[in-house]
A protein has these predicted regions:
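A short N-terminal beta-strand-loop micro-motif at the entrance of redox/enzyme domains
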Residues: 9-15
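Short strand-loop junctions, especially beta-strand C-caps/beta-turns
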Residues: 7-9, 178-180, 230
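Charged, low-complexity surface patches
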Residues: 12, 134, 144, 187, ...
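Fe-S ferredoxin-like electron-transfer domains
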Residues: 46-190, 196, 203-218, 222
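Iron-sulfur-associated redox domains of electron-transfer enzymes in respiratory
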Residues: 15-75, 79, 206-431
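Eukaryote-biased recognition of intrinsically disordered, low-complexity regulatory segments
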Residues: 1-7
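Conserved SAM-binding loop
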Residues: 12, 147, 296
Length: 431
């Protein structure tokens, strides 16, 4: 164990523990913007600086290991002044229109600036504004990028796709798509990890909420919404509901209040998908088609995009079944239209999904028919759903746990476990 003192508190930590981790483990939250443990420990933002007794210059706490006898100050006048200056410099190259930012209220830079009581930027602003394809499901706003390099490292070290890279030098350093490519030509799987780990609003999903609002306001349209199994486990985080209270039934109630005509749980079409995949597996296995590789699920469009760009030789081993999202859309515009006496073109199908790749999946020409349009007309993420709830002034505490509409409200446990690792395989085995 290593013994040191942080802000007058004597603590003991394991060897090779960084000063930042040592402080956080003992209730001293040193702020940071670029730090991701084991992934991005480059001290680029210099917000995590601390003062080490006996040393004139401040040191970064995220990449300096705690040593025996160290005396550290995380909030001395010298630290506060330097930290404030560093944040002000970052803000001078950041588009500070927070009220129109998707991350407003949950932005790391916004929180740190507020904590440091920064109400004015003393430096001349130099904002890097670049064009971006606004039709692509993943949106990058260069004016908000703070060059923390998180997106680069998460894509390189975790996803192994290296979609992002650094370009330029010195003060002109910025982040862009690797090889100066357009994002639509890059091997991006649309996994959303760069969006999740961006500390500001430089990366976000394309917002499709207005399309859904317009459809709900159109009296000629019958709006049918499906809610993916994974959404029920995460929507409560942004609404303040406890996990046991944030049920799928309350999501359905919220969607009905917004103006949806029918709301279903995607577990119904997940059951359809797994029956198709299980039958296909048995057929291909008995025919000897799976001697070299197993059959891979096609449920996840992010995985399908990844396989096509990185392992094209595995594409023939993907299941030919549509994903639950697309099966749901197809059923709604065929069987369900006949059941309720509507034309396919009068049905507007909406998916509430946890993944940005679902937006790209629904746009594929493979899932388009002249008589009905796309199987799925719009996809919104969990974050977009919560935004719509707030826009409609729906208080989560007032939501009731209601069942899905008939006749697609029934589903097995196999469909529910699609949202966890190994869930699709287990569902196939059950089937």
């Amino acid at each position: 164990m290593v013994n040191l003192t942080i802000d007058g508190k004597s603590i003991s930590v394991k060897e090779n523990t960084t000063i930042m981790e040592a402080a956080r483990q003992n209730g001293i939250p040193i702020p940071s913007l670029c730090y991701l443990k084991g992934i991005n420990e480059i001290a680029a933002c210099r917000v995590c600086v601390v003062e080490l007794e006996g040393k004139e210059r401040l040191i970064t706490s995220c990449n300096n290991v705690a040593e025996e006898g160290m005396v550290i100050f995380t909030n001395s006048p010298k630290v506060r002044k330097d930290r404030r200056t560093n944040v002000e410099l970052i803000l001078s190259q950041h588009d500070c229109q927070c009220v129109t930012c998707a991350r407003s209220g949950c932005c790391s830079l916004q929180k740190i600036a507020n904590d440091l009581n920064i109400i004015d930027i003393p430096y001349r602003q130099e904002i890097d504004r670049r064009e971006w394809n606004q039709d692509f499901p993943l949106i990058r706003d260069s004016a908000k990028c703070i060059k923390c390099m998180r997106c680069i490292q998460i894509c390189d070290k975790v996803q192994k796709l290296s979609v992002w890279d650094v370009e330029g030098t010195g003060s002109r350093t910025t982040v862009n798509v690797s090889g100066h490519m357009n994002i639509e030509d890059a091997p991006c799987s649309l996994c959303g990890q760069c969006i999740t780990h961006c500390p500001v609003g430089a990366l976000r999903e394309r917002d499709d909420t207005e399309k859904v609002w317009d459809a709900m306001a159109d009296e000629k349209k019958t709006v049918v919404v499906q809610v993916a199994p994974a959404v029920r486990t995460s929507w409560g985080e942004q609404t303040g509901l406890a996990p046991e209270e944030a049920s799928v039934g309350k999501i359905m109630d919220a969607l009905k209040r917004m103006g949806a005509d029918y709301v279903f749980d995607t577990v119904f079409s997940a059951d359809l998908t797994i029956m198709e995949e299980a039958n296909e597996f048995v057929r291909r296995f008995t025919a000897g088609e799976l001697k070299s590789y197993p059959m891979f699920t096609s449920c996840c469009p992010g995985w399908v995009r990844f396989a096509k760009s990185q392992y094209p030789h595995l594409v023939k081993y993907l299941s030919t079944a549509k994903s639950p999202q697309q099966m749901f859309g197809a059923v709604m515009k065929t069987y369900f239209t006949e059941k309720i006496g509507k034309r396919p073109e009068d049905i507007y199908t909406v998916s509430v999904m946890p993944c940005v790749a679902k937006k790209a999946e629904r746009e594929q020409e493979l899932f388009y028919e002249e008589y009905a349009g796309h199987d799925v007309d719009a996809v919104i993420t969990t974050r977009e759903l919560v935004k719509m709830m707030r826009s409609a002034h729906i208080s989560p505490e007032t939501l009731q746990d209601i069942p899905g509409d008939s006749p697609m409200q029934e589903g097995t446990g196999a469909g529910v476990i699609f949202g966890v690792t190994g869930g699709v395989m287990e569902a196939a085995l059950r089937t």
